[in-house]
From Swiss-Prot:
Gene this chain is encoded by: xseB
Major subcellular site: cytoplasm
Catalytic activity: Exonucleolytic cleavage in either 5'- to 3'- or 3'- to 5'-direction to yield nucleoside 5'-phosphates
Complexes and interactors: Heterooligomer composed of large and small subunits.
Nuclease as UniProt keyword: yes
Cited function: Bidirectionally degrades single-stranded DNA into large acid-insoluble oligonucleotides, which are then degraded further into small acid-soluble oligonucleotides.
Protein name stated in the entry: Exodeoxyribonuclease 7 small subunit
UniProt keyword Amino-acid biosynthesis present: no
Single annotated GO MF: exodeoxyribonuclease VII activity
One CC-aspect GO term: exodeoxyribonuclease VII complex
NCBIfam families in the record: PRK00977.1-4, xseB
GO terms classed as biological process: DNA catabolic process
Organism (species): Rickettsia typhi (strain ATCC VR-144 / Wilmington)
Transmembrane segments: none
Highest classification ranks of the organism: Bacteria, Pseudomonadati, Pseudomonadota, Alphaproteobacteria, Rickettsiales
């Protein structure tokens, strides 16, 4: 697991989410050293942001497809 400031785009949403879940479990367990926990937290933030970005991209793509399928569709604001 690399702790770069950005995530590579070749990781899938599912892989990022799975890694984020593992980080949360490890931090909640409280068995890591402070330094390791901080590094894990930093990686977790990157993964969270990446997952949010992917979800937003998917939502926008679905909205675009829906608009193309029916130009009269009214889209409601949704929170990601």
């Amino acid at each position: 697991m690399s702790n770069t400031k950005t995530l590579e785009d070749n990781i899938s949403f599912e892989e990022a989410l799975r890694e984020l879940e593992e980080i949360v479990k490890k931090i909640d367990n409280g068995q890591e050293s402070l330094e390791t926990a901080v590094n894990s937290f930093e990686r977790g933030i990157l993964l969270k942001n990446y997952c949010e970005k992917k979800l937003k991209e998917a939502r926008l793509k679905i909205e675009k497809i829906t608009k193309l399928a029916d130009s009269t569709v009214i889209l409601e604001e949704t929170e990601v």
